[in-house]
């Protein structure tokens, strides 16, 4: 159960089209993470079991492009602009790879992240 290689972004709500984060910038993002499930279908964005969410904790605040989060997160969020809402579909080599994340993400799992950048 793995999506196509790399990171694919599906825009649900466009951002302002100009303010994208750069390597080393701090971003603040609301998100929900799901395991990729090819039985769910394209209309459901292949969202399988939820493994994490910022809901109830507040948005994630992190530096982007410096290896503090998975590679697919870095790549996908750097493609977003301020105020954008998107689905990031991430292959396992851009996620947690062969090691997975014990107890949450099996080895070699693709991921689907629902991400929302603040409106600014």
From Swiss-Prot:
Its EC number is 5.2.1.8. One of its GO terms (molecular function) is peptidyl-prolyl cis-trans isomerase activity. Residues 24-120 form the PPIase FKBP-type domain. Residues 1-24 are annotated as: Disordered. Pfam families: FKBP_C (PF00254). The keyword Isomerase applies. Signal peptide: none annotated. The keyword Heme does not apply. It catalyses: [protein]-peptidylproline (omega=180) = [protein]-peptidylproline (omega=0). Keywords: Isomerase, Rotamase. It is an enzyme of class 5 (isomerase). One of its GO terms (cellular component) is cytoplasm. PPIases accelerate the folding of proteins. It catalyzes the cis-trans isomerization of proline imidic peptide bonds in oligopeptides. PANTHER family: FK506-BINDING PROTEIN 1B, PEPTIDYL-PROLYL CIS-TRANS ISOMERASE. Belongs to the FKBP-type PPIase family. FKBP1 subfamily. This is FK506-binding protein 1B. It comes from Emericella nidulans (strain FGSC A4 / ATCC 38163 / CBS 112.46 / NRRL 194 / M139) (Aspergillus nidulans). The lineage of its organism: Eukaryota, Fungi, Dikarya, Ascomycota, Pezizomycotina.
């Amino acid at each position: 159960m793995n999506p196509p290689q790399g990171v694919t972004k599906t825009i649900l709500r466009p951002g302002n089209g100009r303010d994208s984060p750069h390597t080393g910038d701090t971003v603040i993002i609301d998100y929900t993470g799901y395991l990729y499930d090819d039985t769910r279908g394209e209309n459901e964005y292949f969202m399988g079991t939820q493994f994490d969410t910022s809901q109830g904790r507040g948005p994630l605040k992190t530096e982007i492009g410096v290896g503090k989060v998975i590679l697919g997160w870095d790549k996908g969020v750097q493609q977003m602009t301020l105020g954008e809402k998107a689905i990031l579909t991430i292959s396992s080599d851009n996620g947690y790879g062969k090691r997975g994340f014990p107890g949450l993400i099996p080895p070699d799992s693709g991921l689907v992240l629902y991400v929302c950048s603040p409106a600014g």
